[in-house]
UniProtKB/Swiss-Prot annotation:
Localization: Cytoplasm
Keywords for the protein's UniProt record, in alphabetical order: Cell cycle, Cell division, Chromosome partition, Cytoplasm, DNA integration, DNA recombination, DNA-binding
Binding partners and assembly: Forms a cyclic heterotetrameric complex composed of two molecules of XerC and two molecules of XerD.
Gene designation per UniProt: xerC
Record-given protein name: Tyrosine recombinase XerC
Listed GO biological process terms: cell division; chromosome segregation; DNA transposition
Species: Chlamydia caviae (strain ATCC VR-813 / DSM 19441 / 03DC25 / GPIC) (Chlamydophila caviae)
Length: 312
Protein backbone atom coordinates (compact mmCIF):
# COMPACT_ATOMS: atom_id res chain seq x y z
CA UNK A 1 0.00 0.00 0.00
CA UNK A 2 2.97 2.33 0.61
CA UNK A 3 4.02 2.02 -3.04
CA UNK A 4 0.46 2.97 -4.04
CA UNK A 5 0.68 6.07 -1.85
CA UNK A 6 3.87 7.11 -3.65
CA UNK A 7 2.41 6.32 -7.09
CA UNK A 8 -0.61 8.47 -6.24
CA UNK A 9 1.57 11.40 -5.12
CA UNK A 10 3.71 11.08 -8.26
CA UNK A 11 0.49 11.17 -10.30
CA UNK A 12 -0.63 14.35 -8.52
CA UNK A 13 2.75 15.97 -9.05
CA UNK A 14 3.51 14.97 -12.65
CA UNK A 15 0.11 14.46 -14.27
CA UNK A 16 -2.21 16.76 -12.31
CA UNK A 17 0.63 19.29 -11.75
CA UNK A 18 -0.46 19.87 -8.15
CA UNK A 19 1.23 22.78 -6.38
CA UNK A 20 3.90 22.13 -3.70
CA UNK A 21 1.41 23.35 -1.09
CA UNK A 22 -1.21 20.83 -2.27
CA UNK A 23 1.33 17.99 -2.34
CA UNK A 24 2.51 18.87 1.16
CA UNK A 25 -1.08 18.68 2.45
CA UNK A 26 -1.63 15.32 0.75
CA UNK A 27 1.54 13.96 2.38
CA UNK A 28 0.35 15.16 5.80
CA UNK A 29 -3.11 13.64 5.33
CA UNK A 30 -1.95 10.30 3.92
CA UNK A 31 0.72 9.96 6.62
CA UNK A 32 -1.96 10.48 9.25
CA UNK A 33 -4.11 7.72 7.74
CA UNK A 34 -1.08 5.45 7.28
CA UNK A 35 -0.16 5.79 10.96
CA UNK A 36 -3.74 4.94 11.94
CA UNK A 37 -3.76 1.80 9.76
CA UNK A 38 -0.41 0.68 11.17
CA UNK A 39 -1.80 1.07 14.68
CA UNK A 40 -4.96 -0.83 13.73
CA UNK A 41 -2.94 -3.64 12.19
CA UNK A 42 -0.51 -3.68 15.14
CA UNK A 43 2.38 -2.99 12.76
CA UNK A 44 5.61 -1.17 13.52
CA UNK A 45 5.51 2.49 12.41
CA UNK A 46 7.22 3.03 9.06
CA UNK A 47 8.99 6.10 7.74
CA UNK A 48 6.72 9.00 6.77
CA UNK A 49 5.70 9.30 3.14
CA UNK A 50 7.75 12.09 1.62
CA UNK A 51 8.24 13.03 -2.03
CA UNK A 52 11.68 14.43 -1.21
CA UNK A 53 12.90 11.00 -0.10
CA UNK A 54 15.28 9.65 -2.72
CA UNK A 55 15.38 6.10 -1.36
CA UNK A 56 11.88 4.88 -0.67
CA UNK A 57 12.08 2.03 1.81
CA UNK A 58 8.64 0.52 1.49
CA UNK A 59 7.46 -1.52 4.44
CA UNK A 60 4.49 -3.77 4.01
CA UNK A 61 1.08 -2.23 4.67
CA UNK A 62 -1.55 -4.64 3.32
CA UNK A 63 -4.55 -3.29 1.43
CA UNK A 64 -6.69 -5.59 3.58
CA UNK A 65 -6.47 -2.87 6.27
CA UNK A 66 -8.10 -0.34 3.92
CA UNK A 67 -11.78 -1.03 4.58
CA UNK A 68 -14.99 0.91 5.15
CA UNK A 69 -14.71 0.15 8.86
CA UNK A 70 -11.13 1.39 9.08
CA UNK A 71 -11.97 4.64 7.29
CA UNK A 72 -15.04 5.13 9.51
CA UNK A 73 -12.97 4.48 12.65
CA UNK A 74 -10.28 6.87 11.42
CA UNK A 75 -12.81 9.68 10.99
CA UNK A 76 -14.24 8.87 14.43
CA UNK A 77 -10.77 9.05 15.99
CA UNK A 78 -10.15 12.46 14.41
CA UNK A 79 -13.43 13.70 15.86
CA UNK A 80 -12.56 12.31 19.31
CA UNK A 81 -9.22 14.14 19.09
CA UNK A 82 -11.23 17.34 18.53
CA UNK A 83 -9.67 17.98 15.15
CA UNK A 84 -11.20 20.90 13.29
CA UNK A 85 -14.08 19.95 10.98
CA UNK A 86 -12.20 21.44 8.04
CA UNK A 87 -9.15 19.26 8.84
CA UNK A 88 -11.30 16.10 9.04
CA UNK A 89 -13.01 17.00 5.77
CA UNK A 90 -9.66 17.55 4.04
CA UNK A 91 -8.15 14.30 5.31
CA UNK A 92 -11.16 12.27 4.24
CA UNK A 93 -11.07 14.00 0.86
CA UNK A 94 -7.41 12.96 0.44
CA UNK A 95 -8.28 9.34 1.24
CA UNK A 96 -11.22 9.43 -1.19
CA UNK A 97 -8.95 10.79 -3.95
CA UNK A 98 -6.40 8.06 -3.22
CA UNK A 99 -9.15 5.42 -3.32
CA UNK A 100 -10.42 6.68 -6.69
CA UNK A 101 -6.87 6.58 -8.05
CA UNK A 102 -6.49 2.97 -6.91
CA UNK A 103 -9.78 1.95 -8.54
CA UNK A 104 -8.90 3.71 -11.79
CA UNK A 105 -5.57 1.86 -11.89
CA UNK A 106 -7.15 -1.49 -10.87
CA UNK A 107 -5.22 -1.69 -7.62
CA UNK A 108 -8.50 -2.18 -5.75
CA UNK A 109 -11.98 -2.86 -7.13
CA UNK A 110 -14.30 -1.47 -4.45
CA UNK A 111 -14.25 2.00 -2.90
CA UNK A 112 -13.98 1.77 0.91
CA UNK A 113 -14.82 5.48 1.20
CA UNK A 114 -17.95 5.52 -0.97
CA UNK A 115 -20.56 5.72 1.80
CA UNK A 116 -18.48 7.72 4.28
CA UNK A 117 -19.01 11.45 4.59
CA UNK A 118 -17.12 14.00 6.64
CA UNK A 119 -18.67 16.56 8.97
CA UNK A 120 -20.73 19.34 7.45
CA UNK A 121 -18.94 22.66 7.38
CA UNK A 122 -20.82 25.82 8.26
CA UNK A 123 -21.08 28.23 5.34
CA UNK A 124 -18.70 31.04 6.17
CA UNK A 125 -19.02 34.32 4.34
CA UNK A 126 -15.70 35.91 3.34
CA UNK A 127 -14.83 38.98 5.40
CA UNK A 128 -13.59 41.72 3.07
CA UNK A 129 -11.68 44.72 4.38
CA UNK A 130 -12.41 48.37 3.64
CA UNK A 131 -10.75 50.46 0.96
CA UNK A 132 -9.12 52.49 3.75
CA UNK A 133 -7.58 49.32 5.20
CA UNK A 134 -6.30 48.37 1.73
CA UNK A 135 -4.62 51.79 1.50
CA UNK A 136 -3.02 51.36 4.93
CA UNK A 137 -1.61 47.97 3.90
CA UNK A 138 -0.35 49.34 0.56
CA UNK A 139 1.56 52.12 2.31
CA UNK A 140 3.45 49.76 4.65
CA UNK A 141 6.34 48.36 2.50
CA UNK A 142 9.58 50.36 2.56
CA UNK A 143 9.92 51.63 -1.02
CA UNK A 144 13.57 52.60 -0.51
CA UNK A 145 14.42 48.88 -0.56
CA UNK A 146 14.14 46.61 -3.59
CA UNK A 147 12.17 43.99 -1.66
CA UNK A 148 9.81 46.64 -0.29
CA UNK A 149 9.18 47.99 -3.79
CA UNK A 150 8.51 44.45 -5.04
CA UNK A 151 6.10 43.80 -2.18
CA UNK A 152 4.16 46.99 -2.93
CA UNK A 153 3.79 45.69 -6.50
CA UNK A 154 2.49 42.37 -5.17
CA UNK A 155 -0.12 44.15 -3.04
CA UNK A 156 -1.14 46.34 -5.97
CA UNK A 157 -1.63 43.27 -8.16
CA UNK A 158 -3.58 41.39 -5.47
CA UNK A 159 -6.06 44.25 -5.22
CA UNK A 160 -6.06 45.15 -8.93
CA UNK A 161 -6.86 41.71 -10.30
CA UNK A 162 -8.03 39.46 -7.45
CA UNK A 163 -5.46 36.77 -8.17
CA UNK A 164 -4.73 33.75 -6.02
CA UNK A 165 -1.31 33.72 -4.36
CA UNK A 166 -0.34 30.58 -6.34
CA UNK A 167 -1.28 32.37 -9.58
CA UNK A 168 0.89 35.38 -8.79
CA UNK A 169 4.05 33.36 -8.08
CA UNK A 170 3.55 31.48 -11.38
CA UNK A 171 3.58 34.65 -13.51
CA UNK A 172 6.37 34.76 -16.11
CA UNK A 173 7.69 37.73 -18.09
CA UNK A 174 5.81 36.86 -21.25
CA UNK A 175 2.50 36.48 -19.40
CA UNK A 176 2.20 40.26 -19.01
CA UNK A 177 1.13 42.48 -21.92
CA UNK A 178 1.71 46.08 -20.88
CA UNK A 179 0.22 47.37 -24.15
CA UNK A 180 -3.21 46.03 -23.25
CA UNK A 181 -2.66 45.70 -19.47
CA UNK A 182 -3.58 42.01 -19.54
CA UNK A 183 -1.98 39.08 -17.70
CA UNK A 184 -2.21 35.46 -18.80
CA UNK A 185 -2.96 33.46 -15.66
CA UNK A 186 -2.64 29.71 -15.14
CA UNK A 187 -5.31 28.86 -12.59
CA UNK A 188 -6.65 25.72 -10.97
CA UNK A 189 -6.71 22.64 -13.18
CA UNK A 190 -4.19 24.27 -15.57
CA UNK A 191 -6.99 26.48 -16.93
CA UNK A 192 -5.70 29.67 -18.51
CA UNK A 193 -7.50 33.01 -18.48
CA UNK A 194 -6.69 36.61 -19.36
CA UNK A 195 -7.08 39.01 -16.45
CA UNK A 196 -6.91 42.81 -16.78
CA UNK A 197 -4.95 44.97 -14.38
CA UNK A 198 -5.55 48.62 -13.64
CA UNK A 199 -3.25 51.21 -15.28
CA UNK A 200 -2.16 52.11 -11.74
CA UNK A 201 -1.04 48.52 -11.03
CA UNK A 202 0.57 48.23 -14.48
CA UNK A 203 2.64 51.33 -13.75
CA UNK A 204 3.94 49.80 -10.52
CA UNK A 205 4.79 46.53 -12.28
CA UNK A 206 6.69 48.31 -15.05
CA UNK A 207 8.72 50.24 -12.50
CA UNK A 208 9.50 46.99 -10.68
CA UNK A 209 10.50 45.28 -13.94
CA UNK A 210 13.07 48.02 -14.60
CA UNK A 211 14.22 48.39 -10.99
CA UNK A 212 18.06 48.43 -11.05
CA UNK A 213 18.38 46.00 -8.14
CA UNK A 214 16.05 43.52 -9.84
CA UNK A 215 18.39 43.30 -12.81
CA UNK A 216 21.27 42.84 -10.38
CA UNK A 217 19.76 39.78 -8.63
CA UNK A 218 17.97 38.15 -11.57
CA UNK A 219 18.91 34.49 -11.99
CA UNK A 220 15.58 33.02 -13.08
CA UNK A 221 15.02 34.27 -16.66
CA UNK A 222 11.33 33.32 -16.61
CA UNK A 223 9.86 34.38 -13.26
CA UNK A 224 8.47 37.89 -12.94
CA UNK A 225 8.53 38.17 -9.14
CA UNK A 226 11.93 37.34 -7.67
CA UNK A 227 13.28 36.96 -4.15
CA UNK A 228 16.49 38.69 -3.05
CA UNK A 229 18.52 35.76 -4.41
CA UNK A 230 17.05 36.11 -7.89
CA UNK A 231 14.83 33.04 -7.66
CA UNK A 232 11.07 32.78 -8.14
CA UNK A 233 9.07 33.83 -5.09
CA UNK A 234 7.17 31.09 -3.25
CA UNK A 235 3.67 31.19 -1.77
CA UNK A 236 5.17 30.66 1.68
CA UNK A 237 7.52 33.64 1.38
CA UNK A 238 4.64 35.90 0.27
CA UNK A 239 2.57 34.67 3.22
CA UNK A 240 5.41 35.56 5.61
CA UNK A 241 5.84 39.01 4.05
CA UNK A 242 2.10 39.61 4.23
CA UNK A 243 1.96 38.78 7.93
CA UNK A 244 4.94 41.09 8.56
CA UNK A 245 3.15 44.02 6.91
CA UNK A 246 -0.02 43.30 8.88
CA UNK A 247 1.96 43.58 12.13
CA UNK A 248 3.65 46.78 10.99
CA UNK A 249 0.38 48.36 9.86
CA UNK A 250 -1.56 47.40 12.98
CA UNK A 251 -4.26 45.63 10.94
CA UNK A 252 -5.94 42.40 12.03
CA UNK A 253 -3.77 39.28 11.86
CA UNK A 254 -6.72 37.36 10.42
CA UNK A 255 -6.31 39.15 7.06
CA UNK A 256 -4.65 36.98 4.39
CA UNK A 257 -3.76 37.44 0.71
CA UNK A 258 -7.01 35.61 -0.06
CA UNK A 259 -8.86 38.29 1.93
CA UNK A 260 -7.71 40.81 -0.68
CA UNK A 261 -9.20 38.57 -3.38
CA UNK A 262 -12.51 38.51 -1.48
CA UNK A 263 -12.27 42.27 -0.99
CA UNK A 264 -11.82 43.25 -4.63
CA UNK A 265 -14.56 40.81 -5.69
CA UNK A 266 -16.94 42.46 -3.22
CA UNK A 267 -15.88 45.94 -4.36
CA UNK A 268 -16.41 44.95 -8.02
CA UNK A 269 -19.93 43.79 -7.20
CA UNK A 270 -20.75 46.92 -5.20
CA UNK A 271 -19.58 49.06 -8.12
CA UNK A 272 -21.93 47.37 -10.58
CA UNK A 273 -19.90 44.53 -12.13
CA UNK A 274 -22.07 41.53 -13.04
CA UNK A 275 -21.51 38.08 -11.52
CA UNK A 276 -20.55 36.37 -14.81
CA UNK A 277 -17.71 38.85 -15.33
CA UNK A 278 -16.52 38.44 -11.73
CA UNK A 279 -16.63 34.65 -12.20
CA UNK A 280 -14.44 34.92 -15.31
CA UNK A 281 -11.96 37.29 -13.65
CA UNK A 282 -11.59 35.13 -10.53
CA UNK A 283 -11.37 31.88 -12.50
CA UNK A 284 -14.29 30.22 -10.71
CA UNK A 285 -15.49 27.07 -12.48
CA UNK A 286 -18.98 27.51 -11.03
CA UNK A 287 -21.12 30.64 -10.81
CA UNK A 288 -22.38 29.31 -7.47
CA UNK A 289 -18.94 29.98 -5.96
CA UNK A 290 -19.11 33.59 -7.13
CA UNK A 291 -22.67 34.10 -5.86
CA UNK A 292 -21.37 34.17 -2.27
CA UNK A 293 -20.24 37.76 -2.87
CA UNK A 294 -23.86 38.87 -3.27
CA UNK A 295 -24.45 37.67 0.30
CA UNK A 296 -21.31 39.48 1.49
CA UNK A 297 -22.40 42.69 -0.22
CA UNK A 298 -25.88 42.49 1.33
CA UNK A 299 -24.38 41.77 4.76
CA UNK A 300 -22.22 44.90 4.50
CA UNK A 301 -25.17 47.00 3.36
CA UNK A 302 -27.25 45.82 6.31
CA UNK A 303 -24.37 46.55 8.69
CA UNK A 304 -23.96 50.07 7.26
CA UNK A 305 -27.71 50.63 7.51
CA UNK A 306 -27.78 49.57 11.16
CA UNK A 307 -24.78 51.73 12.05
CA UNK A 308 -26.16 54.77 10.24
CA UNK A 309 -29.82 54.57 11.20
CA UNK A 310 -30.90 57.07 13.90
CA UNK A 311 -32.99 54.40 15.66
CA UNK A 312 -30.16 51.86 15.87
Amino acid sequence: MISAFYAFLDYLKNIKTASPHTLRNYCIDLNSFKSFLEKQGELSPSSPICLLTKERKETELPFSLFTKDSVRLYVLELMQENKAKRTIKRRLSAIKSFSQYCIKNRIIFEDPTETIHGPRLPKELPSPITYEQVEILMATPDLSKYTGFRDRCLLELFYSSGLRISEIVAINHWDIDFNSNLIRIRGKGKKERLVPMTPHAAQWLQQYLHHPERAHVEQDPQAFFLNRFGKRLTTRSIDRKFQKYLRQSGLSGSITPHTIRHTIATHWLENGMDLKTIQALLGHSSLETTTIYTHVSMKLKKQTHEESHPHS
